[in-house]
């Protein structure tokens, strides 16, 4: 995340210029200009970050591993979830350590202009890639629910990879404006000499440029996408509710609906959690961009928002694997194939499966296939095009890949 609290502190201190000449101590003068060298919330926030780091890194590595390892997990939808996991790992492994270091030592910034550009570009790129990935998977799910035959033809792995290439390319491109206005700022004594250890990574161009960029990107990469996503899931909800009242093709519905509803439910929860976790981040940025004159009460409110937004920002990088494990039986089964047996045995003693949640899972050396998300009630013996070949084909491993690559 971008560090704004020191910037707001600097603006407050511009009103106190007459008192600067009375400060002869370098540390005191630097503290007046840049604020405290170490955040007073360093210890509690670091403890929270450490927990998020462990859960997020382990969880997202598992997500990446099961998608790469199991052929049947390489679906278009899972490719978008893989992209989210990669962006989360970038934030946790590269962004969080920088954030913790800056909380421990706000200044000087030790990594030079290149490090400043990298830090800014990283957070901007991940921010844009995450929301674009969530938007894309929501559009794919919308097509799969409302236009299933079109999705069957067009929703392919190759298409998903091409879309993800565009997503990450656009994310890097749109990160450049904000990155270009950041740099290393040095502070000076009244006599014009540089204050030792005063280098900070911050905005070095006129603030109106920064404010404009933040307001535009918040609109394009949060407000508009979340509005579109909300409409899409509303329409999907209407469609799924309508399907519940249809009596025709009971066997087909019995096979398709549980999986379709389960995946849609999981993605809806994913989007909802994403929106909640990222809202403070954008509130933080917009708050800073709209304040023209800083006062102590405004600075106090902003600093509180900044801390909360930081926790939720990193929390969003850790919760996705938990959502997959809770709401997707396919991911649950895949996780079991990569988790050490000792951990699985301990978990099985505490959570024995009940009869109401039976699953038909077939594990081979290269495949992990789940027939249905939940066991649905049995209908009288009827056959359809979909139901006639599904059980035997799965058991013999002769199902074409395109049949297994369900969204």
Curated annotation (Swiss-Prot):
Molecular function terms, GO-annotated: neuromedin U receptor activity; neuropeptide receptor activity
Membrane protein topology class: Multi-pass membrane protein
Domain of life the protein comes from: Eukaryota
Cytoplasmic side, ranges: 69-79, 140-162, 233-262, 320-407
A GO CC annotation given for this chain: plasma membrane
Glycosylation sites: 6, 24, 191
Alphabetical UniProt keywords: Cell membrane, Disulfide bond, G-protein coupled receptor, Glycoprotein, Membrane, Receptor, Transducer, Transmembrane, Transmembrane helix
Keyword Magnesium: no
Ranges annotated as spanning the membrane: 48-68, 80-100, 121-139, 163-183, 212-232, 263-283, 299-319
Chain ranges on the Extracellular side, renumbered to this chain: 1-47, 101-120, 184-211, 284-298
Main location: membrane
SUPFAM superfamilies: Family A G protein-coupled receptor-like
A single BP term in Gene Ontology: neuropeptide signaling pathway
Subcellular location: Cell membrane
Alphabetized InterPro entries for the sequence: GPCR_Rhodpsn, GPCR_Rhodpsn_7TM, NeuromedU_rcpt, NeuromedU_rcpt_2, NMU-R2_C
Keyword Membrane part of the UniProt annotation: yes
SMART domains for the chain: 7TM_GPCR_Srsx
Disulphide connectivity of cysteines: 116-201
Family the UniProt entry places it in: Belongs to the G-protein coupled receptor 1 family.
PANTHER family in alphabetical order: G-PROTEIN COUPLED RECEPTOR, NEUROMEDIN-U RECEPTOR 2
Functional note: Receptor for the neuromedin-U and neuromedin-S neuropeptides.
Protein name: Neuromedin-U receptor 2
Organism from which the protein derives: Bos taurus (Bovine)
